[in-house]
Design a protein with these regions (language model features):
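Terminal, regulation- and interaction-focused segments at domain boundaries
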Residues: 1-31, 128, 132, 136
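A generic structural signal for well-ordered coil/turn residues at beta-strand boundaries
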Residues: 5-7, 55, 81, 92
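Conserved active-site and cofactor/substrate-binding residues in soluble primary-metabolism enzymes
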Residues: 15, 19, 40, 114, ...
Length: 138
């Protein structure tokens, strides 16, 4: 299922999640994002619920300098950090998606808006890099 919300950045990589994840991590690192959290939903659902599900991970990506500026501008904005990058395997490909930082941080006031725009520009470059790395995208 492809996401169509204007508040979501998305790209489909023609790779299984296990192969797409290092590509995504590399693209994030190139834009100064580190992965500070990781949730493997497939593993958690299997362990906790006995449910088999397709591969699905969320990577919590953070640019520490930018995050520090956001929190300094409005401490409550930490509620929207880090940027969650979702990797979801569908039909042998991996959908990579993220909520636009301007959408996630927009409710925290005008002092955060320019920082959200900077974060979004950086994250958009990550997704552009991922699109450039493949021959087909969605």
């Amino acid at each position: 299922m492809m996401l169509t919300s204007p508040d979501v950045l998305t790209v489909t990589l023609p790779l299984a999640l296990v192969d797409a994840e290092p590509v995504v991590r590399s693209a994030l690192q190139a834009e100064q994002f580190g992965v500070i959290t990781e949730v493997d939903f497939q593993l958690r659902f299997r362990e906790k619920l006995g449910i088999d599900s397709p591969p699905n991970k969320t990577l919590g990506a953070c640019n520490p300098r930018l995050a520090a500026e956001v929190i300094a501008a409005n401490a409550d904005a930490a509620l929207a950090l880090p940027c969650n990058i979702v990797l979801r395997e569908e039909d042998g490909s991996t959908v990579v998606a993220a909520l636009r930082p301007t959408a996630a941080l927009g409710r925290f006031g005008p002092s955060v808006a320019p920082l959200a725009a900077r974060a979004e520009a950086s994250l958009a470059r990550v997704f552009a890099h991922l699109r450039d790395a493949i021959t087909t995208d969605s």
